[in-house]
């Protein structure tokens, strides 16, 4: 179309569906179509148009306007002939490339634009008349056939000879300098039915349009007609703009003679799709103009500013929760902003039609910069005339959805390539969204009930629809939109250039995007599924959009020339009218019709060469695999032979007689599609066996023969290269699994390079190759031969196994519960890829499993499964995969291969079994064990363990790290520390990387410490991810160790001297390495960017470990706790990690997920159990679990407290999970007793109680206006049940523990008890938001359950209050100092024999341990230190330890009246002393210890006040200096400068 000079740039670009670049043109001063003239490829690139197809469409539009403008009769330049360039300056001939839209013509310096010929528009250039299709062949005059044809000289394109109506042309140079003529005879062609227009291939391929034809009306005379057609074509484009949105339909120049005169005007727009059109769908990411941290006012109205990272890219203002978040929390488009204005206190307002956004900057200059930038963009927008507010787009689907992690429902709008989320439909109309999710690279996963997940590379979005049908509709629409982002319409546009191919050959649906290659038909998606059911021997189905890599130019040409109309004349020539298939047909009739049409051939006429239909199908399948595809297919599908007419053939490329195509000796172009990989060579083929075994032997009687193998339609094995008949063959459908055999232990006897094929029926055959290259080539070829296309790109080096698998996973929704999904598994390295493949069952979604990050690999025996087949269970974080093979033989092979790939065995850091944080499990396990049990051990990492045990433990970790469980009673701290140091020392490459050692030393030589630390950060950033994460974990652990230097005597200098030889793998005498490691430990906070919350968490865990002995803390800083389910039994116990931010709701969901418990009608509530089950407190879903557990250390018996999950009826506890509040206050008559007794006495009395707000009121009468007593509920705890010793009047009561008293309230029935309890809980947490039942927490995906793979610290959202409360608790514990008496230290030592070998001298200074470590009390006795160390109590369970020797004395001070039990001898190895001596010594120790504790308790009770009792401290009975437990007698060691000094 012609582009007027003043035509708006947006309207001009809309003609080619590229209006999204209008703002880009306007920003560069190109507001009209006339201003865009003169642009080229480079200029468009500089504008930011990166998509090649988009640039070509704009250039084509510019070229069209230039041609029509140059031929304008009002233009003087159009009347003058343009001089032809000299022969020596003629541009080079373009070389055609497959599926290239335009070929840029380069030449001497001219003013032409890319794609235009220098002779274009000259009067001396002419072209041949194009024959019009007509029903009967009419004789053409000799004058027309022999007329000289003038055109632009083009390079002959033999690939597209079927479209060349002239053949090769001989160029003849004329003496006139302004013309060049090329003449060639035009052979008479078989006319078509109007579906294909024979065009010049140069015109179609390069977009060059020849002008000026002898015998045709003059261009200037027909200008009015062309203009009318162009205007009508534009209107048609406007009407079909939405239907063709996204497709690059390149228009041909407005030459009316190119179009068939038999076509009507309304059909013109349908023929504008070129066979060589292109499609590009790329979104250009804008560069932010402004970005930074700002404070944003919360919309809740409580005047709270939230820290947000804000970006402005010229089109929209986005704010994020963090600068690393991929998705924003809100998007404000520029078109929705009315104005911006600044206000006081460094704030500025962004005003929209719906809301005013308030941001606060750090300075006035920053505020002015934001305001001026936004205001200038607003002015530019108004000058350019953008609508405000913007017109909402027409999305594919809209509706309200629930988003996990979002309080209210969101309004979702699905557009091509993007899913937009808005707060409401009004926000959608204004364009103010939450975030916009690009669908490229995403996947859709349907979950339970009404939920589905959208998996992006950065985050998982979990949605819940209103119903199951809406869920399916959303999932289908999203899946189609995701597939659309992967589509390439280049091949489809070419094939659709034939109008007959724009409708399905079977049902008539529009825009079919599939094709049956051997049948020559283009079909829709629904029919393609039925074609695939026919089998590859009948219909070979390929996608036009997804399988573009296998579409050769010859196949594309075949479909353009043939067309669905010609193919249907062959396949449905005898089909009665009205009996065809309709687009809305159901799968049943559709499949029956397609089977009758193609499998049986009921609707075609008899073929002259193949009377048998099965022979015809075999010939069609063979034709696409042989050379001369076009010739063979057109001969087989020759409908004219049935009608008694002369057969039609495409013209020959040399202009000879049609149908006489020369034979092409080259291999067929379509071999890569039908026969995916053709390969041949010699293989050592063993006979087929029914038993799995090693690779075939190379010598001896059982050595396999060397056969010539050819991989084509089947794997054929010949005796020699020249043998005519194969000895045996294998069909691709017979192969179940391909496996690369592991190298044998003795390569001399067997083939070191071999692979195996497991066949159907439980058979296996081995093949040996001559080398590694041959093995890789054969496995890749065979893998491509029998596997689906989705597996091909994954084949390559490192392939271990490939074959069919059945998959079942709770995360993948199947049509019915327990239904297995069919797919292909590909094992490569340590990754298992699951690919979708057609099969008898529903296809499995594509997925990937990192085997070295698995938590568990197990096999379920056939006796324990309902289908009586073995299942392989892969437990990953957050999900469990069940795999099943086709038979027992391939399942055994898969089990061995996956187990071997998931194991370790290597000495490289990357070869270890990893945790979720990419940290080797051995490092995580050792650090966790030392953190839990060794921080208080004096000389930790300095004292060595038994070398034999350390080597054995390291070998176990390398063999299978996830199966190693470090337990205090079985493993010793010294052995674990030796194992950790040995692991780092024996790595192939040190964790700090040997290639970066010079940079480490260079950084250590810098004079300033700040410079050194910054340089260390740079070097750490250069490390691989696994090295970087492992080093950070190790340094963080050493930082915690040196924080306890007052107890373990291990300062930073000592740790650096010990670990430098292992971390850097040096001799240990290098001063630089020791200095680097020492400064890394000291500067851990700054070097690794540890925030304040994490620092407080580290301090908290160190305080807990050093004060509370029975706590277990992993190196990640989370508390490891035991949670029971329904009953306090060992089998019902689950161990997991509890972070400071974990709520009771999240804990419940995690435990139920770990146990695989399905949600029912009952609610699961977490209870805090005290008094061995007498008191149960239901935790509010929003309560922090760790904050409650920290208070157990104040109990007389901390081991009596635990966590328990119980099912509660919905009617009793349902109100805890809703936001509904009671309209009237809770009031009722209860029987009450308080302790200590004051007003109510020591008996249960009936009183009226009123719950008002956050206070519990005691009323004299029900209608009393003034209460007698009032108790605030802040900090109160309500427990179900009353201690039995108080003899409650009813079994239904609850205990309210206040700050200085206990209140016991008895109810009439259980419902009343639950009503009061839940009302008190809701009153205490009335400011919390209502929770969602059985919804995963926001940190479920990032938090790992406790096993042998702990995680790095997980930072919560609001851990400040939790940490503050925990620190306050710890301060009180430090002041009281009672923990050391209640929790004796557990020590882990070797056996008696090993201690004799490695006996160390007794230290002169006392070894300070907690009270209960008996060596302190008998330091002056004659018993040796090594003997008394064996008597330390070792509880079996760290959290629920048994009664130790000091617990009878604790029961005396208990207020709960626990009975005393006689002391039991502690378990442990036998000592050298006699039993009588040891028994008398124990009795003496117990008596002395009890007298000391009782005397100290009486003394402190007499001196201290009742409100603030002081904690007892045990004096030294032997005259040693009194020492507070946990503190040394001398200050910790300090760093010494010389590196050669021994350890202090």
UniProtKB/Swiss-Prot annotation:
Note the zinc finger regions (C4-type) by start and end residue. 504-527
Coiled-coil region(s) at which residues? none
Q: Where would I find the Rho-GAP domain in this sequence? A: 907-1088
Biased composition (Low complexity) is annotated at 1482-1492, 1502-1527
Per the record, residues carrying Phosphotyrosine are 1403, 1408
Please list the residue ranges that the record marks as compositionally biased, kind Polar residues. 1438-1457
GO terms, biological process: cytoskeleton organization; regulation of actin cytoskeleton organization; signal transduction; vesicle-mediated transport
Q: Which residues form the SAM domain?
A: 4-68
Residues annotated with Phosphoserine modification: 1444, 1480
Q: Which PROSITE patterns does the UniProt record give?
A: ARFGAP, PH_DOMAIN, RA, RHOGAP, SAM_DOMAIN
Give the superkingdom in one word.
Eukaryota
Q: SUPFAM superfamilies from the xrefs?
A: ArfGap/RecO-like zinc finger, GTPase activation domain, GAP, PH domain-like, SAM/Pointed domain, Ubiquitin-like
List, as start-end ranges, the regions of compositional bias called Pro residues: 82-97, 130-139
| Annotated site, Arginine finger, chain positions | 942
User: Phosphothreonine (modified residue): where?
Assistant: 1348
Q: What post-translational modification information does the record give?
A: Tyrosine phosphorylated at a low basal level. PDGF treatment stimulates phosphorylation. Tyrosine phosphorylation is increased in cells that are in the process of becoming attached to a substrate and that start spreading and flattening.
Q: Which UniProt keywords apply?
A: Cell membrane, Cell projection, Cytoplasm, Cytoskeleton, GTPase activation, Membrane, Metal-binding, Phosphoprotein, Repeat, Zinc, Zinc-finger
Q: How does it assemble?
A: Interacts (via SAM domain) with INPPL1/SHIP2.
Free-text function comment from the UniProt entry: Phosphatidylinositol 3,4,5-trisphosphate-dependent GTPase-activating protein that modulates actin cytoskeleton remodeling by regulating ARF and RHO family members. Is activated by phosphatidylinositol 3,4,5-trisphosphate (PtdIns(3,4,5)P3) binding. Can be activated by phosphatidylinositol 3,4-bisphosphate (PtdIns(3,4,5)P2) binding, albeit with lower efficiency. Acts on ARF6, RAC1, RHOA and CDC42. Plays a role in the internalization of anthrax toxin.
What is this protein identified as?
Arf-GAP with Rho-GAP domain, ANK repeat and PH domain-containing protein 3
The organism's lineage is: Eukaryota, Metazoa, Chordata, Craniata, Vertebrata
**What gene is this protein a product of?**
ARAP3
């Amino acid at each position: 179309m012609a582009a007027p000079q003043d035509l708006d740039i947006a309207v001009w670009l809309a003609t080619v569906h590229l209006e999204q670049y209008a703002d880009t043109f306007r920003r560069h001063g190109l507001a009209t179509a006339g201003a865009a003239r003169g642009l080229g490829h480079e200029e468009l690139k500089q504008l930011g148009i990166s998509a090649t197809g988009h640039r070509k469409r704009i250039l084509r539009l510019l070229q069209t306007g230039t041609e029509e403008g140059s031929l304008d009769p009002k233009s003087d330049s159009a009347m003058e002939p343009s001089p032809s360039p000299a022969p020596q300056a003629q541009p080079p001939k373009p070389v055609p490339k497959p599926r290239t839209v335009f070929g840029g013509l380069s030449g001497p310096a001219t003013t032409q634009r890319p794609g235009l010929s220098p002779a274009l528009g000259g009067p001396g250039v002419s072209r041949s008349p194009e024959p019009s299709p007509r029903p009967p062949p009419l004789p053409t005059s000799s004058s027309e056939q022999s007329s000289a044809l003038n055109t632009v000289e083009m390079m002959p394109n033999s690939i597209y000879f079927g479209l060349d109506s002239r053949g090769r042309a001989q160029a003849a140079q004329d003496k006139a300098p302004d013309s060049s003529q090329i003449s060639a005879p035009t052979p008479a062609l078989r006319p078509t039915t109007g579906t294909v227009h024979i065009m010049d291939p140069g015109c179609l391929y390069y977009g060059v349009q020849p002008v000026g034809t002898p015998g045709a009306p003059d261009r200037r005379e027909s200008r009015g007609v062309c203009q009318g057609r162009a205007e009508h074509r534009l209107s048609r484009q406007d009407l079909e703009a939405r239907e063709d949105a996204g497709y690059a339909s390149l228009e041909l120049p407005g030459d009316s003679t190119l179009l068939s005169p038999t076509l009507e005007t309304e059909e013109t727009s349908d023929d504008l799709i070129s066979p060589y059109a292109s499609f590009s769908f790329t979104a250009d990411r804008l560069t932010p103009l402004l970005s930074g941290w700002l404070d944003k006012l919360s919309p809740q109205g409580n005047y709270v500013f939230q820290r947000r990272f804000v970006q402005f890219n010229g089109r929209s203002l986005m704010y994020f929760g963090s600068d690393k978040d991929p998705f924003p929390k809100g998007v404000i488009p520029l078109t929705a902003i009315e104005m911006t204005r600044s206000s006081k206190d460094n704030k500025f307002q962004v005003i929209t039609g719906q809301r005013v956004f308030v941001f606060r900057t750090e300075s006035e200059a920053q505020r002015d910069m934001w305001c001026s930038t936004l205001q200038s963009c607003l002015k530019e927008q108004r000058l350019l005339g953008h609508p405000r507010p913007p017109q909402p787009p027409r999305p594919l689907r809209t509706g309200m959805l629930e988003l996990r992690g979002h309080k209210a429902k969101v309004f979702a709008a699905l557009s091509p390539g993007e899913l937009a989320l808005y707060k409401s439909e009004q926000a959608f109309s204004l364009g103010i969204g939450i975030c916009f999710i690009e669908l490229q690279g995403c996947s859709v996963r349907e979950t339970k009930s009404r939920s589905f997940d959208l998996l992006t590379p950065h985050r998982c979005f979990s949605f819940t629809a209103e119903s199951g049908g809406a869920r399916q509709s959303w999932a289908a629409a999203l899946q189609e939109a995701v597939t659309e982002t992967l589509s390439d319409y280049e091949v489809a546009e070419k094939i659709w250039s034939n109008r007959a191919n724009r409708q399905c050959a079977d049902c008539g649906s529009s825009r079919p995007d599939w094709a049956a290659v051997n049948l020559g038909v283009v079909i829709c998606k629904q029919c393609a599924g039925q074609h695939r059911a026919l089998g590859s021997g009948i219909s070979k189905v390929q996608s036009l959009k997804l399988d573009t890599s296998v579409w050769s130019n010859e196949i594309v040409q075949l479909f353009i020339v043939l067309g669905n109309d010609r193919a249907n004349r062959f396949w449905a020539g005898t089909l009665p009218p009205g009996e065809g298939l309709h687009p809305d047909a159901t799968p049943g009739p559709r499949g029956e019709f397609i089977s009758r049409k193609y499998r049986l051939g009921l609707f075609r006429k008899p073929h002259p060469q193949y009377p048998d239909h099965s022979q015809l199908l075999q010939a069609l399948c063979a034709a696409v695999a042989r050379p001369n595809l076009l010739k063979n297919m057109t001969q087989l599908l020759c409908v004219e032979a049935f009608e008694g007419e002369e057969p039609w053939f495409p013209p020959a490329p040399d202009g000879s007689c049609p149908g006489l195509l020369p034979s092409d000796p080259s291999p067929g172009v379509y071999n890569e599609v039908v026969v995916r990989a053709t390969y041949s060579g010699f293989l050592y083929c063993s006979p087929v066996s029914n038993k799995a075994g090693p690779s075939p032997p190379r010598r001896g009687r059982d050595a396999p023969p060397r056969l010539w193998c050819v991989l084509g339609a089947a794997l054929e094995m010949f005796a020699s290269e020249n043998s005519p008949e194969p000895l045996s063959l294998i069909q691709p459908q017979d192969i179940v699994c391909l496996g690369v055999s592991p190298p044998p232990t003795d390569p001399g006897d067997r083939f070191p390079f071999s692979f195996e094929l497991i066949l159907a029926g439980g058979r296996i055959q081995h093949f040996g190759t001559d080398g590694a290259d041959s093995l890789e080539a054969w496995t890749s070829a065979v893998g491509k031969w029998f596997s689906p296309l989705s597996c091909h790109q994954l084949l390559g080096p490192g392939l271990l196994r490939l074959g069919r698998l059945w998959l079942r996973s709770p995360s993948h929704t199947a049509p019915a519960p327990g239904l297995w999904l069919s797919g292909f598994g590909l094992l490569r390295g340590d990754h298992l890829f699951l690919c979708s493949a057609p099969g008898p069952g529903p296809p499995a979604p594509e997925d990937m499993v990192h085997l070295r990050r698995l938590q568990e690999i197990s096999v379920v025996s056939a006796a324990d499964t309902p289908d009586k087949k073995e299942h392989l269970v892969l437990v990953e974080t957050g999900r469990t995969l069940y795999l099943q093979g086709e038979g027992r033989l391939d399942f055994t092979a898969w089990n061995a291969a996956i187990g071997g790939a998931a194991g370790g065995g290597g000495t490289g850091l990357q070869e270890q079994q990893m945790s979720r944080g990419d940290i080797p499990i051995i490092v995580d396990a050792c650090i966790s064990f030392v953190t839990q049990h060794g921080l208080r051990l004096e000389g930790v990492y300095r004292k060595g363990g038994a070398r034999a045990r350390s080597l054995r433990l390291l070998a176990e970790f390398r063999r299978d790290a996830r199966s190693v469980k470090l337990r205090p009673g079985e493993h010793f701290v010294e052995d674990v520390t030796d194992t950790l140091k040995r692991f780092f020392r024996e790595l192939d490459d040190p964790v700090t990387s040997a290639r970066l050692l010079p940079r480490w030393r260079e950084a250590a030589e810098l004079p300033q410490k700040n410079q050194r630390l910054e340089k260390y950060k740079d070097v750490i950033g250069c490390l691989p991810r696994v090295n970087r994460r492992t080093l950070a974990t190790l340094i963080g652990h050493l930082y915690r160790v040196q924080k306890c230097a007052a107890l373990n005597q291990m300062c930073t200098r000592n740790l650096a001297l010990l670990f430098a030889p292992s971390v850097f793998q040096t001799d240990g005498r290098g001063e630089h390495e020791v200095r680097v490691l020492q400064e890394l430990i000291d500067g851990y906070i700054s070097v690794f960017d540890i925030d304040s919350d994490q620092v407080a968490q580290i301090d908290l865990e160190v305080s807990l470990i050093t004060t509370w002995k029975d706590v277990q803390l992993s190196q990640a800083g989370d508390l490891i706790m035991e949670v029971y389910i329904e009953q306090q039994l060992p089998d019902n116990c689950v161990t997991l990690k509890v972070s400071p931010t974990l709520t009771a709701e999240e804990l419940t969901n995690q435990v139920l997920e770990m146990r695989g418990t399905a949600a029912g009608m009952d609610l699961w509530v977490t209870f805090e159990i005290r008094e061995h089950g007498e008191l149960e407190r239901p935790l509010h879903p929003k309560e922090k679990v760790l904050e409650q557990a920290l208070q157990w250390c104040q109990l007389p018996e901390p081991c009596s407290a635990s966590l328990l999950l119980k099912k509660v009826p919905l009617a009793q506890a349902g109100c805890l999970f809703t936001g509904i509040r009671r309209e009237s206050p809770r009031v009722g008559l209860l029987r009450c007793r308080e302790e200590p007794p004051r007003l109510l006495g020591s008996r249960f009395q009936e009183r009226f109680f009123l719950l008002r707000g956050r206070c519990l009121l005691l009323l004299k009468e029900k209608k009393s206006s003034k209460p007698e007593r009032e108790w605030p509920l802040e900090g109160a705890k309500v427990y179900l049940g009353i201690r039995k010793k108080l003899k409650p009047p009813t079994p239904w009561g609850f205990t309210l523990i206040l700050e200085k008293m206990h209140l016991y309230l008895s109810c009439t029935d259980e419902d009343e008890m639950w009503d009061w309890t839940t009302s008190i809980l809701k009153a205490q947490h009335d400011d919390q938001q209502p929770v969602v039942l059985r919804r995963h927490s926001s940190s479920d995906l990032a938090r790992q359950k406790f096993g042998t793979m702990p995680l790095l610290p997980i930072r919560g959202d609001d851990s400040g209050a939790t940490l503050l409360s925990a620190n306050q608790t710890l301060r009180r514990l430090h002041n009281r100092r009672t923990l050391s008496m209640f929790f004796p230290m557990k020590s882990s030592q070797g056996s008696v024999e090993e201690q004799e070998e490695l006996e160390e001298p007794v230290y002169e200074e006392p070894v300070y341990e907690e009270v209960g470590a008996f060596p302190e009390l008998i330091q002056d006795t004659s018993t040796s230190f090594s003997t008394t160390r064996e008597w330390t109590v070792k509880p079996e369970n760290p959290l629920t330890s048994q009664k130790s020797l000091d617990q009878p004395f604790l029961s005396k001070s208990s207020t709960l009246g626990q009975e005393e039990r006689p002391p039991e001898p502690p378990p442990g190895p036998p000592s050298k002393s006699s039993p009588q001596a040891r028994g008398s010594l124990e009795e003496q120790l117990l008596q002395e210890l009890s007298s000391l504790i009782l005397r100290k308790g009486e003394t402190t009770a007499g001196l201290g006040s009742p409100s603030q009792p002081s904690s007892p401290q045990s004096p030294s009975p032997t005259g040693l200096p009194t020492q507070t437990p946990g503190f040394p007698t001398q200050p910790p060691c300090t760093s010494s400068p010389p590196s050669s000094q021994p350890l202090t």
